[in-house]
Amino acid sequence: GKIVWQTDVGKGAGGVMYGSGIDGEKLYVALAVRQDRPTAEPPNVLAALDLATGTVAWTVPAGKPVCAWGPKPCSPAHAAAVTVVPGAVFSGGADGHIRAYATRDGRLLWDFDTAAQPYKAVNGIEAHGGEIGGGAQIVANGALYLNSGYTQAGRMGNALLMFTAEGK
C-alpha cells in the first residue's frame, strides 16, 4: 500500500531497534542511540505515536543507566523490541533492566534489574542476566517471559526469566 503517515521520532545516529508494538490506539517504538554518537536527539527514548495520525503522543527518556556490572559498557538504550499488553508497554534495556510503562502517559510502572542477581535455572545451573536486546518479551498465560543476556556491548548473560502479575 500507500503511506498513510510518516513521523521522524529520532534524529542522528540510532533509531528504532528491532520492533514496535501497537494496542489499537498507539504505536510504541523504542529508540536506541549508540553511546559514541552523542549528537543524536532525542537520545534513547520510548515513544508513543497516535496510530491514526502519527502524531507523537508522549516520549519518555531512558534516563541514566544503572548497570549491575559497573559503568562500562553501560547504556540506557531501549535495545529490544517492545511488548504491549492492555495498559502497559514493556521495554528491555541495554542496562539489563526490564521496565513497564503506562500506555496512557508513559509513566514508569515497574523496573526490575535482571543482572543484579544470579538465578537458579531449571537445569540446576546458575544463570546470569545481562543486557536485554533484540527480540521482544513474550506474554502468555498471565506471565511475562524475557531473555536477559546479549553480547552486543560485551556483557553476556544466559537467563530466561518469567514474571507473574504478582511480581514473582
Q: Which functions belong to the PLM regions below?
A:
Residues 1-17, 21-78, 83-134, 138-168:
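Extracytoplasmic/lumenal domain signature
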